[in-house]
Amino acid sequence: MQDSPLIIGSRQFQSRLLVGTGKYKDLNETDLAIQASGAEIVTVAIRRVNIGQHADQPNLLSVIPPEKYTILPNTAGCFDADSAIRTCMLARELLDGHNLVKLEVLGDQDTLYPNITETLKAARTLIDDGFEIMVYTSDDPIVAKELESMGCVAIMPLGSLIGSGLGILNPHTISIIKENAKVPVLVDAGVGTASDAAIAMELGCDGVLMNTAIAAAQHPVLMASAMKKAIEAGREAFLAGRMPRKRMANASSPETGYFFK
C-alpha cells in the first residue's frame, strides 16, 4: 500500500519523524543522529542555540543546513505569549522570512506543561502575522479543536511531560484529538523508546516529534535508527488495520478438513 505524504501547511514530507537538537554531547553526534533518524524536519530552540545570532559561537546550521532540512524554530523556554511572539519574529528574521514555527508556551518550570491561555493568545497573534503554527498543547480534545479552528497547521499534544520518557499516558484522548482533526496531529513530548513511538503511530497520529528519547539514550545514533523503524512500523500497522480485540480465544487453525476424526 502506497502511503500519502505528510502535509503540514504548505509543505509536504515523506518522513513522519521530527527530531530536536538539544542535549547531544557535540555537533558531530547531533549530525549523525539526525542522519540516522531520516528526519526531514529538525526543530531548534531559538532561545538556546545559535543559528546565526551569535557570530562568535558554533552555528548549528553548519550540521543542519536549511537546503537539506526544514528548520522548525521553536519557542522552548517561553512562559508567556509576548516572549513566544518575539522569539518567532527573531526566528523569521534569522531564517530569511521562514514562517513555519513550533509554538510552545510553558506553564511552569517543574512540569513544562503548556499554558493554554497564553498559547491561544500567541497563536492568534502569530497566525494574523502570517506564521504557520505547529502548536504544542495538552491532550484536551476541546483545546486541540480550538487551536485548529483558529488556523494552526498542526496540533501537537503531549504524550507525557517533556523529557520524562513516560510514553503515551492518555492514548484515548489523543485518539479523540486525531479523529476530530482536519490537520495533522503529531505526538510531542514524553516518548522514551521505540515502542512509544510505534504506539503513537498505531493510534493514527500523523507523526512524532522527539529529542530526549534519542539524545539521552546510551547510544543516540543507534536509538535514532530504532525510532525511524518504529515510526515506519507503527504507521504501516495503522494503515494495515489491526485485528479486533476479543474477550475469548479464537483458534487460528482451520476447523474443517481434519485428517483424523
Swiss-Prot record:
The terms under GO molecular function for this entry are: thiazole synthase activity
Per the record, the domain of life is: Bacteria
Record CDD domains: ThiG
Metal-binding: is it a keyword of this entry?
no
> What keywords were assigned to this record?
Cytoplasm, Schiff base, Thiamine biosynthesis, Transferase
Instruction: Provide the active-site residues from the annotation.
Output: K102 (schiff-base intermediate with dxp)
Enumerate the residues binding 1-deoxy-D-xylulose 5-phosphate: G163, A189, G190, N211, T212
| Catalytic reaction(s) noted | [ThiS sulfur-carrier protein]-C-terminal-Gly-aminoethanethioate + 2-iminoacetate + 1-deoxy-D-xylulose 5-phosphate = [ThiS sulfur-carrier protein]-C-terminal Gly-Gly + 2-[(2R,5Z)-2-carboxy-4-methylthiazol-5(2H)-ylidene]ethyl phosphate + 2 H2O + H(+)
Recorded hits in InterPro entries, A to Z, give: Aldolase_TIM (IPR013785), Thiazole_synthase_ThiG (IPR033983), ThiG (IPR008867)
Compartments, record wording: Cytoplasm
Which pathway features in its UniProt record? Answer: Cofactor biosynthesis; thiamine diphosphate biosynthesis
Q: Does the keyword Transferase apply?
A: yes
Subunit comment for this entry?
Homotetramer. Forms heterodimers with either ThiH or ThiS.
Q: What is this protein called?
A: Thiazole synthase
